[in-house]
Amino acid sequence: MHNQAPIQRRKSKRIYVGNVPIGDGAPIAVQSMTNTRTTDVEATVNQIKALERVGADIVRVSVPTMDAAEAFKLIKQQVNVPLVADIHFDYRIALKVAEYGVDCLRINPGNIGNEERIRTVVDCARDKNIPIRIGVNAGSLEKDLQEKYGEPTPQALLESAMRHVDHLDRLNFDQFKVSVKASDVFLAVESYRLLAKQIEQPLHLGITEAGGARSGAVKSAIGLGLLLSEGIGDTLRVSLAADPVEEIKVGFDILKSLRIRARGINFIACPTCSRQEFDVIGTVNALEQRLEDIITPMDVSIIGCVVNGPGEALVSTLGVTGGNKKSGLYEDGVRKDRLDNDDMITQLEARIRAKASIMDEARRIDVQQVEK
């Protein structure tokens, strides 16, 4: 029930990764990267499908060898989500996956080779209508920039990015997006701010090598949150040393928190105290797992007592306010029923699913009316 975020997004050029629009006001795409061996086709396909199920818009796959490129061909045939091939060192691999229908090429110009090799990749991408992501990383800056700046700085990342943007401009190729990633939050944020002022191309956001599931999520939320709140960013990846599925979940959580893009349930829950009338923590944890399949955007407040419960319920799609033995259930700000505290999880799950079904049907009717 909360309004859309009052964020003025940076104007950027529109490109497409497969059928996913990027830039020019398109929804911010959430992506992840497989961590299986690409040559293990079955494992990689299974992981990509798991990422699709939790809402991944785009999936990146590392293609380090020609054997991996041959595996990529088989993988591409078995999945629906657009795939980005991550290419380093050997430009010929980029040419090979282009033959196999890759949706986007991610190259690091600092290690892909000389200008002639970059030209060959760009010409191939142009012929096959494949966009490119220029991926600049603080950990792999060109040697001359390392010597010039002494260490990774925002200016160094910007210069690296602009060097390769200018190269693509000279080749008259504009179907690309750019990233300037670093593991340091402030370095990454300032680099993106500088780049956003220099080009109109879409920007792919990320805090690279952010860390484990908890620390990486925190660093990404801070870094990406700062940029997104300033209107910077057209696609994002939360990089975690964890199951890639968690990257998608955290990515959507960041967008939901900023009210930029909603998918699934936004749970609002109190941290609990001695006033709670039912097990709030257990209820929230159980419902988050049980309701992962719900993609309908809605706010659900679960508050253990009457101090803040009614106020949160007023601005939630569904809200529960703790009471003695039974807790009040609100729908769209109106108190509707009381739920047994001892059976809270089952009852609330049923109410949420029913509400999601009603909302989905209402949206379906609205779409049909627009199409008429």
Curated annotation (Swiss-Prot):
Q: Name the gene behind this protein.
A: ispG
Q: Name the residues that span the membrane.
A: none
Q: Which UniProt keywords apply?
A: 4Fe-4S, Iron, Iron-sulfur, Isoprene biosynthesis, Metal-binding, Oxidoreductase
- Can the keyword Iron be found in this entry's annotation? yes
Q: Which NCBIfam families match?
A: ispG_gcpE (TIGR00612), PRK00366.1 (NF001540)
Q: Which EC numbers characterise this protein's activity in its record? A: 1.17.7.3
| Pathway the protein acts in | Isoprenoid biosynthesis; isopentenyl diphosphate biosynthesis via DXP pathway; isopentenyl diphosphate from 1-deoxy-D-xylulose 5-phosphate: step 5/6
Presence of the UniProt keyword Oxidoreductase in the record: yes
Q: Name one GO molecular function term.
A: 4-hydroxy-3-methylbut-2-en-1-yl diphosphate synthase activity (ferredoxin)
The identity of this protein, by name, is: 4-hydroxy-3-methylbut-2-en-1-yl diphosphate synthase (flavodoxin)
Its Gene Ontology biological processes?
isopentenyl diphosphate biosynthetic process, methylerythritol 4-phosphate pathway; terpenoid biosynthetic process
Q: What does this protein do?
A: Converts 2C-methyl-D-erythritol 2,4-cyclodiphosphate (ME-2,4cPP) into 1-hydroxy-2-methyl-2-(E)-butenyl 4-diphosphate.
Q: Name any cofactors this protein relies on.
A: [4Fe-4S] cluster
Locate the residues binding [4Fe-4S] cluster: C270, C273, C305, E312
What is the similarity comment for this entry? Belongs to the IspG family.
Catalyses:
(2E)-4-hydroxy-3-methylbut-2-enyl diphosphate + oxidized [flavodoxin] + H2O + 2 H(+) = 2-C-methyl-D-erythritol 2,4-cyclic diphosphate + reduced [flavodoxin]
Cofactor note from UniProt?
A: Binds 1 [4Fe-4S] cluster.
